[in-house]
């Protein structure tokens, strides 16, 4: 008989509770990502000086590039390659969720996906017989946060926390952004990609995802980044790039 042990059914918190919205925001129904990220997108459009129509073309072309990556990713949730026109055109199967985002510009969290990472010392990896050419080393890490209340942020068209964290993680690794071969930006909505690219100094027309992103690759809630890391680790192992 297995020696089953009874564990406490109450989860142990690993961080403090975070209040995400002010009463004034809630009163205006600004509480969920589908209401918040469209505000960021509108700010980015205004700063760029684009018309609504031109900006829809711009962000749909961005997401078409993500869809093209997903079409070649064997682990992607949606392998159909969408055109920019299909992504921006509102239809019965691509309804408007929160202007300016139709469904195909929103994170797809209705998925059944999982990913895992194994972290260990080099000594342990050697003892387990993992070939040396399969080892992937994390070089550095950093953590920063924008203000939880969006009404307290100075602007909606930039993300100082990402800029600071990105600069610091590169400093710790002794690299520049141009030294990074493989990039996967968080992509719950097009504005997240634009903000991340701008803050990190990345070309918006470059390949900014290795999975296809949260809409096409799949957006399993707060576990997406693990999928991105696992995908990049696999590509590093296969020699697609040296850094990611």
Feature map (PLM): residue ranges:
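Short glycine/threonine-rich catalytic loop with a Thr-x-Gly-x-Asp
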Residues: 224
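Short, intrinsically disordered, charge-balanced linker/junction segments flanking boundaries
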Residues: 242-244
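Conserved "HGTGT" condensation-loop signature of ketosynthase/thiolase-family condensing enzymes
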Residues: 1-124, 130-217, 227-230, 234-237
């Amino acid at each position: 008989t297995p020696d089953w042990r009874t564990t406490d059914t109450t989860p142990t918190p690993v961080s403090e509770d975070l209040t995400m919205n002010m009463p004034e925001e809630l009163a205006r129904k600004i509480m969920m990502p589908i209401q918040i990220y469209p505000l960021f997108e509108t700010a980015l459009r205004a700063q760029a000086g684009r018309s609504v129509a031109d900006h829809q073309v711009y962000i749909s072309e961005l997401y078409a590039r993500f869809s093209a990556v997903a079409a070649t990713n064997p682990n992607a949730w949606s392998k159909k390659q969408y055109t920019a026109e299909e992504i921006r055109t509102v239809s019965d199967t691509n309804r408007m969720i929160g202007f300016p985002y139709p469904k195909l510009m929103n994170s797809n969290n209705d998925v059944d996906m999982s990913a895992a990472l194994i972290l260990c010392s080099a000594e342990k990896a050697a003892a387990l017989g993992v070939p040396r050419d399969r080892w992937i080393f994390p070089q550095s890490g950093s953590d920063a946060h924008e203000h939880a209340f969006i009404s307290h942020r100075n602007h909606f068209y930039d993300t100082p926390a990402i800029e600071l964290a990105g600069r610091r993680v590169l400093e710790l690794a002794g690299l520049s952004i141009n030294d990074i071969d493989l990039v996967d930006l968080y992509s719950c909505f097009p504005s997240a990609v634009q903000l991340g690219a701008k803050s990190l100094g990345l070309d918006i027309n470059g390949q900014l995802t290795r999975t296809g992103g949260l809409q096409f690759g799949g957006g399993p809630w707060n576990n997406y980044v693990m999928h991105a890391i696992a995908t990049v680790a696999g590509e590093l192992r296969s020699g697609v790039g040296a850094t990611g």
